[in-house]
């Protein structure tokens, strides 16, 4: 409920899945939540004790869009070295390092599912590769002062009962300053 949404620390939010009896049966979250689950429940097996699935489409006309985030790289100098670095970072070889060491999802289709460190991340990569529509999380595309600042606190303020018009004005003001 409202109290839980406002008071439970982010990393503790999946805990209800693992109580006896469970306090919840589903938890919508990004794949990185696994790091919190693994730290708090080291005896649980990914893919056996907990798993992931795609939320069904609201309207088949619009498909089943995936919402996510991503790390972006940019070249600011048009040099041979910059081009070589960009090509390397896009290669399966480089992305296998990200997958194995950081638990990230590869965007290079030549990265084998066998290199993923656990079944959840491998399944998430498969889901991503089969997606017809992908959209970046809007808050991740906003300047930090907005996306992880006033937008985040504004949502919490709204859930706690603050007037929506006031919340939106606060977010818009910070966006005007950030952009």
Annotated model-derived regions:
Residues 10, 25, 29, 74-81, ...:
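Extracytoplasmic/periplasmic, Sec-exported soluble proteins
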Residues 121-122:
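Flexible, small/polar- and glycine-enriched "cap/hinge" segments at structural transition points
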Residues 1-39:
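Extracytoplasmic ligand-binding clamshell segments of periplasmic binding protein
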Residues 15, 83-90, 95-99, 152-156, ...:
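Non-transmembrane alpha-helical segments in soluble domains
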Residues 1-11, 80, 84, 162-169, ...:
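Helix-loop-helix "hinge/cap" segment bordering the ligand-binding cleft or interdomain interface
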């Amino acid at each position: 409920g409202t109290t839980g949404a406002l008071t439970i620390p982010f990393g503790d939010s999946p805990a209800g899945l693992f109580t006896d009896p469970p306090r919840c049966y589903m938890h919508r979250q990004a794949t990185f939540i696994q790091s919190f689950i693994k730290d708090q429940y080291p005896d649980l097996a990914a893919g056996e004790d907990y798993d992931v699935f795609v939320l069904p489409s609201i309207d088949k006309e619009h498909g089943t869009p995936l919402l996510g985030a991503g790390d972006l790289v940019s070249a600011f100098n048009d040099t041979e070295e910059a081009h070589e670095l960009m090509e390397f970072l896009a290669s399966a070889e480089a992305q296998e390092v990200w997958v194995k060491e950081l638990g990230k999802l590869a965007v290079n289709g030549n990265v084998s599912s066998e290199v993923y460190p656990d079944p959840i991340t491998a399944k998430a990569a498969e889901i991503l590769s089969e997606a017809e529509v992908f959209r970046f999380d809007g808050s991740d595309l906003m300047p930090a002062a907005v996306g992880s600042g006033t937008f985040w606190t504004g949502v919490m303020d709204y859930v706690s009962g603050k007037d929506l018009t006031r919340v939106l004005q606060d977010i818009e003001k910070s966006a005007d300053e950030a952009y």
